[in-house]
């Protein structure tokens, strides 16, 4: 059942709105890239996803559900968290270097923060931390939402690494994500990292515990 936002959440919501306005040039830049790269349909889908998040606080379900237990998208808000809970989301992985859900008071108890600078790939050890967190949460019956600012680069890189770790090739992993989010825009560095990750296939449990 949805509850009224706490004062901390209300402040976080206002701060997030201010940040959203500040992010508008980046949103428009991504929109233009999407239009040039994949045409008007993908650009329109990108806009629908973005403005749905602005209005409801959560992305459209059909643009975020990669597998039944793994969803990916952009920044949610306190208003949007109940919508994610209705979809069964129990845990969150945040890759935004510029915004910590926990500090904003909108993180669930099962929360992993992997701060990554925008347009850069996460480190391999952070990929492993994220993969183990997702695996453990799903194994315990949970459902995970992975996000960055717009849900087109940093977050989908982690999801691609998770899918590769589950046995998919990099191309299969990207195709699986694109079925849900046709407008993703991983950078060349992020794509290269997944290729490298697939070739090396590190022992994540050993790497994280070292």
Predicted ranges, named:
Residues 32-33, 99, 157:
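Sequence-pattern detector for short linear motifs
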Residues 55-143, 161-198, 202:
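Cysteine-based protein phosphatase catalytic domain of the PTP/DSP
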Residues 1-55:
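Non-catalytic regulatory/accessory regions that flank a structured catalytic core
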Residues 203-210:
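PRPP-dependent phosphoribosyltransferase catalytic core
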Residues 141-160:
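A phosphate-binding catalytic loop at a beta-strand-loop-alpha-helix junction
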Residues 11-13, 40, 82, 133, ...:
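Low-complexity, charged, repeat-rich alpha-helical/coil interaction segments
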